[in-house]
């Protein structure tokens, strides 16, 4: 009873992919399942999303895990390869690679592969992280075209740095740069992430790369409301994180609650102790007042988050009982709200769920 539970609704996951495909019917879906499927389970997500056109993972280990469990769909490794041994595995296991630096090009030229490789040339249009500059990209593209180790045509991609910003100036500049530099290049193109998918319909080219929206979470957080209604109407949260009440206490006015005595009862009142803490991945920096959902009603967090427990104010739920489920985020309580309260983003909360949490799959 005292383990927190992450309930993964695989029906919602499939639904979200179908919505993405319906909204971009001319594009193929290269779905992002890196970082353990955004915390939802790498293999679980891949098996549920069998209708995806390709999977995107961060590193070769994630790709090999998918191949080992029988996933045969195209898999593209976003960070590519870094030595000859890895490159050989890419060929052996039919993995696609994002090419973003000259060292990778050199490895391709000097390594004898058993089969040719599917690659995507990453063009840095302003993210300033990975990729070849706009000025370098034509020469690299021409160099890759001559390689017998590479399947043709070569994929062409960029990554948007600021697509979740209501100010569109920089993102429009990135898109303009990408279209300009690739004008004379032949190959499938890919530009948008989840935020770009909604905000920049002109960039819905051959391939789209949905990530956080697959899991029913807005890429805009709670501050950018232009697409709020559309997202809430069409997409469903996949993960619901819950834990049970393990104790109920009646505290007196001015009693403090939790480490550091940071919160005191304003009056005589009931509180509940809930079996979840930062050891499970609940954010330690969530402040008093952060909402949880108990029997359909909001109750506020009180006091500091401990490793294994939190305390909540029961004044609005005086009939709560030990064993009742408390929803920390998910169905009925968007994780974006919790992230905002904790001063972080939903992505981080999802990815920080620990092994102590029990995962359950449902179809609902």
UniProtKB/Swiss-Prot annotation:
Signal peptide: none annotated. Pfam families: Ala_racemase_C, Ala_racemase_N. Its cofactor is pyridoxal 5'-phosphate. Disulfide bonds: none annotated. It comes from the Bacteria. Substrate binds at residues 129, 307. The keyword Isomerase applies. InterPro entries: Ala_racemase, Ala_racemase/Decarboxylase_C, Ala_racemase_C, Ala_racemase_N, PLP-binding_barrel. One of its GO terms (molecular function) is pyridoxal phosphate binding. One of its GO terms (biological process) is D-alanine biosynthetic process. It catalyses: L-alanine = D-alanine. Pathway: Amino-acid biosynthesis; D-alanine biosynthesis; D-alanine from L-alanine: step 1/1. Belongs to the alanine racemase family. Catalyzes the interconversion of L-alanine and D-alanine. May also act on other amino acids. This is Alanine racemase. The gene is alr.
